[in-house]
Design a protein with these regions (language model features):
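Polar/acidic, low-complexity leader/linker segments enriched in S/T/G and N/D
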Residues: 1-61
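A glycine-rich, hydrophobic loop/mini-helix early in the fold
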Residues: 47-97
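Beta-strand elements of well-folded, non-transmembrane domains
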Residues: 77, 104-108, 144-148, 161, ...
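Short secondary-structure capping micro-motifs at structural edges
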Residues: 82-92, 99, 119-131
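Beta-strand-rich interaction surfaces with strong enrichment in secreted/lumenal proteins
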Residues: 88-90, 144, 168-170
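Oligomerization/assembly interface segments of phage tail-like spikes and tubes
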Residues: 89-112, 173-188
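Short helix-loop boundary/capping segments
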Residues: 108-159
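Mixed-charge, glycine-accented linear interaction segment located at domain edges/termini
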Residues: 154-212
Length: 212
C-alpha cells in the first residue's frame, strides 16, 4: 500500500532535549537498534550484521542548550532553461554542499580529545592540538526528544567529516562551549534516490522509534 499524506499530530515535535552520538563512518542503524537510542544512554551497541562486527555509538553527553545543532546548505540555486518554443521548459539545480555545527559543554579530557583531535601531553596532564584542522570521518546521529509527549526523532549523517570549529567559547552567564563542524558527504551505505544518486542524510520520524 502506497504511503499517503495526512494529518499526523503525533509527529509534531519540539526539540526540548537532545543528544549527539558518534560512531565509525558509514555505520547505519537498523530498526531493531533504533529504539535503543535514549537521551541518557552512554553508548548503544548495534546488532552485528553479516560478517561485520558490532559497532557502537557513543553519546557525547551534555551539549549546548543555547547553541543547538544547526544545518546549512550552500549552492543548489535553480536555473530555468527555455526553448525557442516554450518558456521555462526545464529547471536545473547547481551542486549543493551541506554542513552541520553543534557545541559540547563538557570539558573533560576524552571529549576534548575527540573534538580537537588532540593528543596527550608528555606527562599525561593536559592535551595538545594544532590549529590546522584534520577532519575525522564519523557517523553522527543527532537525537531529539519532545519531553511534553515523549516522542523521539533523529537525523543520521553516516559520512560526516568532523572537526573543531573554534577554540573554547567563554562566558560568565552560560556554560563554556566547544564547537564542532562537519561537512556532509554522500554515503554508499544509504540507498540511492529516485535519480540513482547516493544519499547523504537519513531521518527517523516518531513512528520509526516504535516500529516492531
Amino acid at each position: 500500500m502506497a504511503d499517503t499524506l495526512g494529518i499526523h499530530g503525533e509527529s509534531v515535535t519540539q526539540a526540548v532535549r537532545g543528544a549527539v552520538f558518534l560512531c565509525d563512518a558509514e555505520t547505519l542503524i537498523g530498526k531493531a537498534d533504533l529504539k535503543k537510542f535514549e537521551l541518557t544512554a552512554e553508548k548503544v551497541e548495534l546488532t552485528a550484521s553479516g560478517s561485520e562486527s558490532a559497532k557502537t555509538f557513543y553519546n557525547m553527553g551534555h551539549m549546548s542548550n543555547d547553541t543547538l545543532p544547526e544545518f546549512s546548505l550552500d549552492g543548489g540555486d535553480a536555473t530555468n532553461l527555455s526553448t525557442w518554443l516554450e518558456a521555462s521548459f526545464r529547471t536545473s539545480y547547481n551542486e549543493t554542499t551541506g554542513k552541520v555545527t553543534f557545541s559540547s559543554v563538557q570539558g573533560d579530557k576524552t571529549t576534548l580529545k575527540t573534538i580537537y583531535n588532540a593528543v596527550d601531553m608528555p606527562d599525561n596532564v593536559g592535551i595538545a592540538f594544532g590549529l590546522v584542522k584534520t577532519p575525522v570521518a564519523k557517523s553522527v546521529l543527532i537525537l531529539w526528544q519532545d519531553t511534553n509527549t515523549g516522542e523521539r526523532s533523529a537525523l543520521l549523517l553516516p559520512n560526516l567529516d568532523l572537526a573543531f570549529s573554534n577554540l573554547p567559547s567563554l562566558s560568565t552567564d552560560k556554560f563554556t562551549e566547544y564547537g564542532m563542524e562537519g561537512s556532509i558527504k554522500t554515503s554508499k551505505k544509504l540507498p540511492k534516490d529516485a535519480s540513482g544518486k547516493y544519499c547523504s542524510v537519513a531521518i527517523f520520524d516518531t513512528a520509526d522509534f516504535k516500529a516492531v
